[in-house]
UniProtKB/Swiss-Prot annotation:
KW Transcription (keyword) present: no
Subunit (UniProt): Interacts (phosphorylation-dependent) with CHEK1; regulates CLSPN function in checkpoint for DNA damage and replication. Interacts with ATR and RAD9A and these interactions are slightly reduced during checkpoint activation. Interacts with BRCA1 and this interaction increases during checkpoint activation. Interacts with TIMELESS; the interaction is required for leading-strand replication. Associates with the MCM2-7 complex and other replisome factors. Interacts (via the acidic patch) with CDC7; the interaction is required for phosphorylation of MCM proteins and CLASPIN by CDC7.
Tagged with keyword Phosphoprotein: yes
Function: Required for checkpoint mediated cell cycle arrest in response to inhibition of DNA replication or to DNA damage induced by both ionizing and UV irradiation. Adapter protein which binds to BRCA1 and the checkpoint kinase CHEK1 and facilitates the ATR-dependent phosphorylation of both proteins. Also required to maintain normal rates of replication fork progression during unperturbed DNA replication. Binds directly to DNA, with particular affinity for branched or forked molecules and interacts with multiple protein components of the replisome such as the MCM2-7 complex and TIMELESS.
Gene name of this polypeptide: Clspn
Biased composition regions of type Acidic residues, renumbered to the chain: 65-74, 108-118, 205-228, 632-657, 967-977, 990-1002, 1043-1052
Parts forming coiled coils: 159-187, 599-626, 1001-1036
Keywords tagged on the record: Acetylation, Cell cycle, Coiled coil, DNA damage, DNA repair, DNA-binding, Nucleus, Phosphoprotein, Repeat, Ubl conjugation
Stated name of the protein: Claspin
């Protein structure tokens, strides 16, 4: 056994050499240089310095190791090994691996906590069996597995206690020390290996960035490096292990002394091996440095590729093609994710060596993601192998046991991870590992590693030759090399794995990587997300598409069964079932989409057409009324027609008047009855017209216009009811048939039209109440403001008067006539007074309406009658609307006897008297003219008017609301505004007050609508008349009193006229300012004209316009002078006188100018002026003026005839070429600066026919009328002789022959100018 031990020692020494070489070579193999600093290899040329600096530490540790804990390593004592030679190698490996793994425990416990040490050591031993042949794998066993293994080792130690404790304790102490040293060395290598790993891009491994304290345990280990002392410790450890194992195998053949000898011998050989290894390491290092320098490989960290900014924002590319630094964390996610990441092109070349060495590991079937650096992988494998050697050497059974325990420990401490699988795979694939190592040498891409291997082999062989054991040395060299290289990185791997596993157990997500940018979910955004409008619109559109809107329900009639409580004949109450037809209005779904494309437009157009028809109808009637008012002839015709119609109706009317107006008491009763009847008839008419009439006319408020064709508006005695019904039906039918057709003139038609329009059209729209104005003298009279509510103030006169407040006519009688003279336009619109079909104008009616829907009567009146005060629109509109001559007559006459009694009386009067009264009223002869202004409201009084004053009084009484209910109506009107134009609703309301029994519900509805409309209308009307005051006064005057209308007429008229004047006429200040403006303008024009004349007369030619170069050229033509300008503004005969005066003055100065020019020409021919004017300056103008003045005086002395002849001769001989020596050709280009001859020619050419139209500017020549031509001829003779005189001084080539000059009549061309 001693020989065996000696051989083992030799092997160990040789192995130590190899190990030292391997330790030095391992960095070179990876091509990465020193682990510690990541510096270029050139900086680490001598490892000797490191060894020297580290030796003292390691020696010190060896010296102190004797006194240190001894109770930990019982496991090596187990007598389980049979083959001593095998055990030697295994012990060598295990000793190294254990010694390398111990520093880990030292970091934690610092030699005091020895339990950690075996636990850390044991993983290595556990992994070793699988990696024993020197297989390199990139995975180490988890730190946690060591704990269980340590327990098994403790069990083994307990078994070995049979041995002498002292010896074992001593051996254990040395073993512990050696292990600690080895572990420190491993730590050093591991820390060195860590740094190249930093290139993997995993920031978690960068201790500068993440000082988590997880790797603090490594700090102490960094201080120690691989040194010869550690190698010696490993040798001692193996020797001691051998000693421990031999007693078990050979029944304790060895004694303690043998062990001491062995230790001495091994110490000697250690020193020798240390020297050799040192030299070998130096050689190897220098050689590897040379190879690295010469190699063409671009190391990824040594020659970095230039990077763009994008590369900095990307994750750092992994230095290897497979896996990343996160593989250390055993993260499946990272392994799968980063496995595919490619390395930068520059890195790929440097990876060759690493890939090849790692490729061998992959071929072994490890199945785990390899480490990023070949070095780390190799060192890990070495450590695992070394650690496992010991266990394997002890016993194969033990090895299986360790494997099982390791697996259990893994499953206990952390979830089963790829690392666990890798361990089992590594163990099972041990036999293949050496083969793979052989492949490494053959790899073409790995040029450096093979060379290094050759170096290693050479050194190994040398040392083997010295020791005399070449074979054993070779084997041990291979195993030891693997062990040393692998041991460098295994412990750090384990540490990382352990910390990662601990983190996972604590619930920390290890896969997360730190980055500069914030995560999407790292911020809590409190702002509401912005809505995507386009998306919402798309949703809405899709919703509309998916859910088509329901089609609107059409108008339909439904029969509703109701139960009514009736009083039977016997006085008992009975419940009866009745069926009531209810018309459901068409549903208006505004949002509803119409089935057809243009359906909505068509519906709107149809509605508009209907509304326009009604509007046109009303406007037609208004125009007719206006037309008739304007043409008083129409009144007479209408009156005749009305008489004819009235004859049939008047009897009934008189009866009704007697019946209604006999007394106030009877009147109220009758009114109630008639209201009911009227409502019935109106409702019937409304039905016939297919228009819903909310309420038939109310007798009072509607001015009783409906009463009958007689002006008892709307009061229909029961006897007359049938008649009125017929008329109404007829009129309504006609309206339906033809909007443009004339409406029936009967009051019934009036009623129907009123209902029709009122019900259909909002009250603010004027309704053509007068359906057939000509024929419906009654309706007009009776229904004077057929749509009282519809017409704002205009109806007020008629409507409000019917209510009683407005009993006073809205217009004074005088004004009523003038009122309509203003608008002659309507005449053209009407086919005839009798015809009320104004179809031609239907389309244009809208233009004639104002914003409120009324005719633009006001505008016409302003245009034509600016002088007259405007009548309040109320009266205008009412009259226009009603257009019933009856109403108009009543209004004009102002005879509104608010007393029904009076009304009855007038009807009794003869028709002739009525006709006379009507004529008188139309003609403006109002017997009751003072009172008449109050009367305008009684529009319906056409029939009554046809009767004598009494019928007029009746009509006035009815219209004026002399009925007891007038007070109530007044109150209502005041509420609604300043006035209620008998809006039909208002009228109804008043009737309702009187006849609340008849139609309470209908009236309420109508009143609501009317109130709104009336308020709007009243606001507008306030501008034109102070109606509130007027209504109050009127109410006091006409009230419900039945006094005679004459009592109040005068006062009312005066008050009304004053109001109108105040409203219409501008204030005195305004008038004064306007007059001043006009006066000043005329004065200024006159001054300018005179100034111009003076300038032309006294300034030299051209001086008038020689002010500056920028002057405007002004040409004065004969007929486009002041006279033409005056024409533009003065069209009246008064202006003609002014024009004549202007013409005279103009003729004079023209005459004078021509004379001056002639004289100047004569002087020029004599050459006097030519010489002078060249020398003359501005001052010499006085001389020229003096000459002109003298010449003018001489010419004036000549007879007037001579002057005229001369001037005319000049004009008539425009072609004389008189050249005044060119002196007068001024430099400026103005026309007036031309030579006088040219000016004369122009004047002659432009001599126009004065009789021609004044403003005809487009033609120059006018033929003279024959008489004027003759006159011209006559005057030409004297001119010829005269011509001779003047031409003698300045002969012209075209001189006329001098015929005997017969003195012609004194005629001047200026006569034409004047005309």
């Amino acid at each position: 056994m001693t020989g065996e031990v000696g051989s083992e020692v030799n092997l160990e020494v040789n192995d130590l050499k190899l190990l030292s070489q391997e330790a030095a070579d391992s960095p070179v193999d990876s091509g990465q240089g020193s682990f510690e600093t990541l510096e270029p290899l050139s900086e680490r040329d001598s490892d000797e310095e490191i060894f020297v600096s580290k030796k003292p530490k390691s020696r010190k540790v060896l010296q102190d190791s004797d006194s240190e804990a001894e109770d930990r390593d019982d496991a090596p004592e187990k007598p389980t090994y049979d083959d001593s030679a095998e055990d030697t190698q295994e012990n060598l490996h295990s000793g190294k691996s254990q010694s390398r793994s111990f520093p880990k425990a030292l970091a934690d416990s610092d030699e005091s906590d020895m339990e950690e040490t075996p636990s850390q050591e044991s993983p290595e031993t556990q992994e070793a069996p699988s990696l024993e042949p020197g297989h390199q794998t990139g995975h180490s066993v988890d730190f946690t597995t060591g704990r269980k293994l340590s327990k098994t080792l403790l069990r083994e130690g307990a078994e070995g206690k049979a041995k002498s404790k002292r010896r074992l304790e001593k051996e254990e102490r040395t073993m512990e020390k050696i292990r600690r040293l080895k572990k420190k060395e491993t730590r050093c290598e591991e820390s060195d290996a860590d740094r190249p790993l930093n290139d993997s891009g995993c920031l978690l491994e960068d201790s500068d960035l993440f000082e988590t304290g997880l790797e603090e345990e490594n700090d102490s280990a960094l201080e120690d490096e691989e040194s010869l002392e550690s190698i010696r410790a490993a040798v001692k450890n193996k020797v001691k292990n051998r000693k421990k194992k031999e007693p078990t195998l050979e029944s304790e053949a060895f004694s303690l002394e043998d062990g001491n000898e062995l230790s001495k011998g091994s110490a000697r050989k250690e020193r020798k091996a240390a020297r050799l290894s040192k030299e070998a390491l130096k050689k190897l290092h220098s050689e590897t440095q040379r190879l690295v320098r010469e190699s063409a490989l671009n190391l990824p960290y040594h020659m970095p590729e230039s990077k763009t900014i994008h590369d900095f924002f990307k994750r750092k590319p992994r230095p290897t093609c497979q896996g990343s630094a996160m593989a250390l964390l055993k993260s499946c996610k990272y392994q799968s994710g980063h496995y595919k990441e490619t390395v930068n092109p520059a890195d790929a070349a440097g990876m060759g060596a690493e890939d090849s060495s790692r490729g061998s590991e992959q071929r072994t079937g490890a199945g785990i993601a390899a480490e990023t650096n070949v070095l780390s992988e190799v060192s890990e494998e070495a450590g695992i192998t070394a650690g496992s050697d010991e266990a394997c050497g002890k016993d194969p059974v033990r090895r299986g046991e360790l494997e099982i325990e390791e697996t259990e420990k893994h499953s206990d401490d952390r979830p089963y991870s790829p690392g666990d699988r890798s361990m089992s795979q590594q163990e099972s694939s041990i036999p293949r590992i050496e083969d793979n190592e052989g492949h490494q040498a053959g790899d073409l891409t790995e040029s450096d590693p093979p060379a290094l291997e050759g170096e290693e082999l050479k050194t190994v062989e040398k040392t083997d030759a010295k020791e005399g054991m070449p074979e054993q040395k070779t084997q041990s060299a291979a195993a030891a090399a693997v062990a040393v290289v692998t041991a460098a990185a295994a412990p750090p791997e384990k540490v990382r794995r352990f910390t990662v596993d601990r983190l996972r157990q604590l619930g920390v997500d290890v896969s997360s990587q730190p980055r500069l940018g914030a995560d999407e979910d790292s911020f809590v955004i409190l702002d509401e997300p912005k809505t995507n409008r386009e998306l919402e619109a798309l949703k809405q559109r899709f919703w509309r598409h998916a859910n088509p809107a329901a089609s609107p329900r059409a108008c339909q009639t439904v029969n509703v069964n109701i139960i009514v409580k009736d009083l039977g004949t016997n006085g008992k109450e009975e419940l009866k079932a009745e069926v009531v037809p209810v018309t459901l209005a068409a549903e208006k779904l505004e949002g509803a989409s119409h089935a057809k494309p243009g359906e909505k437009l068509q519906m709107l157009k149809a509605k508009l057409q209907e509304a326009m028809k009604l509007r046109r109808l009303e406007e037609r009637q208004k125009r007719q009324a206006l037309f008739k008012l304007d043409n008083e002839d129409g009144f007479e015709e209408e009156e005749e027609e009305e008489e004819m119609t009235d004859e049939s109706e008047e009897d009934g009317e008189e009866e009704t008047t007697e019946y209604l107006l006999g007394s106030e008491d009877t009147e109220t009763k009758d009114e109630k009855e008639t209201d009911k009847e009227n409502t019935d008839t109106s409702s019937d008419i409304g039905k016939s017209v297919a228009l819903c009439v909310p309420k038939p006319l109310s007798s009072d408020s509607t001015l009783l216009l409906f009463k009958d064709s007689s002006s008892k508006m709307g009061y229909f005695p029961t006897e007359e009811k049938s008649e009125t019904d017929e008329y109404l039906a007829k009129q309504s039918d006609k309206l339906d048939e033809d909007d443009s057709s004339s409406l029936l003139t009967k009051e019934s038609s009036h009623n129907s039209s009123f209902e029709l329009i009122g019900s259909t059209i909002p009250s603010y729209q004027p309704c053509n109440r007068q359906i057939g104005r000509g024929a419906s003298f009654l309706p007009t009279a009776g229904f004077r403001s057929p749509s009282p509510g519809l017409f704002r103030g205009s109806l007020i006169s008629s409507a409000s008067k019917s209510s009683g407040k407005l009993s006073e006519p809205s217009l004074p009688v005088e004004d009523s006539q003038d009122l309509y003279t203003a608008s002659p336009e309507p005449k053209t619109l009407f086919l005839g007074a009798g015809d009320f079909q104004f179809c031609l104008e239907d389309d244009t009616q809208s233009q004639l309406l104002d914003a409120d829907g009324f005719l633009n009567i006001r505008n016409h009146r302003h245009r034509y009658q600016a002088v007259k005060p405007q009548l309040p629109l109320a009266s205008m509109d009412e009259n226009a609307m009603d257009a019933n001559m009856d109403e108009l007559l009543d209004l004009c006459t102002g005879q509104f006897t608010s007393q029904p009694e009076e009304k009855c009386q007038p009807r009794k009067n003869d028709k002739k008297e009525n006709m006379e009264e009507l004529l008188n009223l139309c003609s403006g002869k109002f017997p009751t003219q003072d009172a008449s202004p109050v009367a305008p409201l009684g529009l319906r009084s056409q029939e009554k008017e046809s009767s004598t004053e009494d019928p007029m009084e009746e009509a006035l009484a009815l219209c004026s609301g002399s009925f007891p209910t007038d007070r109530e109506e007044e109150g209502e009107e005041e509420e609604f505004g300043d006035f209620q134009l008998v809006s039909k609703e208002n009228g109804f309301a008043s009737d309702e007050d009187e006849h609340s029994d008849s139609n309470d519900e209908e009236l309420a509805l109508d009143l609501e609508d009317d109130e709104e409309e009336l308020l709007k209308q009243s606001e507008k009307m306030k501008r034109q008349m102070r109606l509130k005051k007027y209504l109050e006064d009127e109410a006091e005057v006409s009230g419900s009193d039945v006094g005679s209308e004459d009592e109040y007429d005068g006062e009312e008229i005066d008050e009304y006229e004053e109001d109108v004047i105040d409203e219409v006429l501008p204030s005195d200040e305004e008038l004064e300012s306007q007059i001043k403006k006009i006066h000043m303008k005329t004065m200024l024009d006159d001054d300018k004209r005179r100034l111009r004349l003076y300038q032309e007369r006294y300034l030299a030619d051209g001086d008038l316009h020689s002010d500056g170069p920028g002057r405007t050229r002004k040409f004065r033509w004969k007929h486009i002078d002041d006279t033409s300008q005056m024409d533009l503004f003065h069209r009246d005969s008064d202006d003609d006188q002014v024009e004549e005066q202007l013409d005279e003055t103009e003729a004079k100065w023209r005459k004078e100018r021509i004379e001056r020019e002639q004289w100047l020409r004569e002087q020029a021919q004599q050459g006097k002026i030519a010489a002078d004017e060249e020398d003359i300056g501005d001052d010499s103008q006085f001389m020229m003026l003096a000459k002109k003045v003298t010449a003018k005086a001489l010419q004036k002395n000549a007879s007037h005839t001579v002057v005229v002849q001369e001037s005319k001769s000049v004009l008539r001989n425009p072609f004389e070429t008189i050249r005044p020596g060119g002196a007068h050709q001024l430099k400026t280009g103005s026309l007036l600066n031309q030579p006088k001859a040219v000016l004369q020619k122009l004047a002659a050419l432009s001599d126009l026919n004065p009789s021609a139209p004044r403003n005809s500017r487009n033609f120059v020549f006018h033929t003279l009328s024959p008489t004027k031509a003759e006159a011209a001829k006559d005057s030409s003779k004297p001119q010829v002789r005269r011509r001779g005189l003047s031409s003698m001084m300045s002969p012209s080539p075209k001189r006329l022959k001098t015929n005997g000059s017969s003195p012609g009549p004194k005629r001047s061309i200026f006569r034409y100018l004047e005309s």
